[in-house]
Amino acid sequence: MKAQDLQFTQLLEGSKQFIIPIFQRTYSWEQSHCQQLWDDVVRVGKSTELNSHFIGSAVYIPETNVDAAIPRWLVIDGQQRITTVTLLLIALKQRLEAENLDEPISAAEVEDYYLRNRYGKGEAAYRMLLTRTDKEPLMWLVDGKEPGEEGSYRIIENFKFFKEQIARADLGDVWRGIKKLMIVDVCLQQGIDNPQMIFESMNSTGKALTQADLIRNFVLMGLKHELQTRFYNDYWRPMEIEFGAENYINEFDEFMRYYLVIHTGNVRIRKGDVYDEFKAYSRKYEVEALLDSLKEFTGYYCRIALGKEKEKGLAEAFHDIRELRADVCYPMLMEVYQDFRQEQIRHEEFLSVLRMVEGYVFRRAICEIPTNSLRQTFATFMRQVKKDRYVESVKAGFLMLPSYRRFPDDDEFIRQIQIRNLYKFNRRSYWLRRFENHRRKERVPVQDYTIEHIMPQNNDLNAQWRADLGDDWKRIHEQYLHTLGNLTLTAYNSEYSDRSFAEKRDMSGGFKESPLKLNQGLGACEVWNESAIKKRGENLAKAAVDIWPAPNLPEDILHAYKPVPPEGTSYTISDHPHLQGGLARELFESFRVQVLALDECVNEEYLKLYVAYKAETNFVDVVPQARGLRLSLNLNFPEIDDPRGLCRDVTNLGRWGNGNVEVRLEKLEDINYILGLVRQALEKQMGEDEEV
């Protein structure tokens, strides 16, 4: 590798061609980047004290024999700034040409020195060759032609920006500023330097690369040019097209995170860690096999998450799940989609699984069960699925989920859906649409209707409403206003919302004439009071069980899926000498009661040398000692929030118990504080830092 400080203009001088590899992202600098460059050029050009201005690096590697008449260099880093200064040079050339100026430099000199190779034929005539949609627009500009409308928007708009700036600028200042631009010129040697490692280490200015950019470059950069082109055209470009331009920018990183969750089993990959995780994962696979897998799962993701599914039943199910905003289930659904494509399940079985997932997420939301465990649940769910008993094993998996991860049963769901504030429920349009269109052949456009409170929202109800509700009207209004029994859809104007129930029922377009399923029965109702609201709420709640059903299996079948307890020696408190009395026993009894009360999912297990408390797995282990208890918290030391500094980092130290945080409990007055530390370990295991 050869690196040197160099004037930017010297980089472009001489017969050569800089080529942007096909896998590199297209030109993406925005006007703000161009404005900054322009301001720097003018500032340094006007200054008699500033002799240079550093704009970053240019890293390139030979594509062909460097001794060729016109050597070709593949740009590894610096595409954005080289392209942008080239646009500035074209704008400068055009003004010099238009005004027939020879000072401070002639248009012919700009073209010969920096833009064209005089003796190059065809594309070899251009000093810089961009990729894909950027390629022709830059060539047209160098040729003095107007780019077509189908060309790169950024190339054209940024050229126009520089043309406008140069039109009113002092050309002497501009040219002096351009000549003072400096770069770090890094020329790599083919077969010796690793362009990917160098690319990653560059601390470049400009627009940050996304995780997707880094992954694409990592996969394709080390290949020969012919393979780069084939793999890009056969695999990566189809993925970009499948996503679409905007979704590729906004969604690809998230897709890659879910892809890695599926294939690595690591459910805690954060968006900023996707690239590093991918590099570690990719080393096990040939490039083409890896790209083929990415392309396959791109198809699944786009159908599930981006509405690209063509089959009607699946499209409707995916739409419902998207409207629930249950993105965390996508890893599971992509795996199920793969099984469907491989004919391990039939179409109706696939739909059954999708509706179970939908019901699981919606029932939990209605029952206000914290969402924090969902990411872990869905990321690991497919490990227990038996491909020869697919739907049965999915049902069993949902039915065996414990406490905070449970699938709410019918009793809990019916009870909660009647009392929830469904008007302020953040999936309001979803549940209204699902209620109205369940088992309908012709879908009702729910978005054309407005949500209606049958008993009005007005806290100061009129005399008729007070009479209908009775003496206890204030309590009834407060208790039932936003609940299932009092909410419906209407097409009439909201100005009628305070009218009496009889008027709403009998008016033109009122409840009696409503074609909506949600309004069935309201036309025959004589009075709207607490009894009527409760009855309607009960009826709709029973209907909800049919819309969002819970899985069901005979007990003998479900029992076969339950894990068999391991055989071996069992221990009790009597096997721990330090727990037979004294302070350690007193501390332990107080501690265990409060730990078990943290959540109903917490289990206690006596082992030979310590007592384990676990939800999914151990989150705190208690080692009884003569003077108290030694606790091992299943956290990495940097994760613990310990204002009093009681914890000790035991990373890489041999000990009994799990985790890298140790704390001693030797005084009863410390129990509440230490329970706060223990809760952190439990919350991490339950995924309380994750949201749907």
Where are the model-predicted features located?
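Short, conserved beta-strand/beta-arch hydrophobic-aromatic motifs that form part
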Residues: 605-661
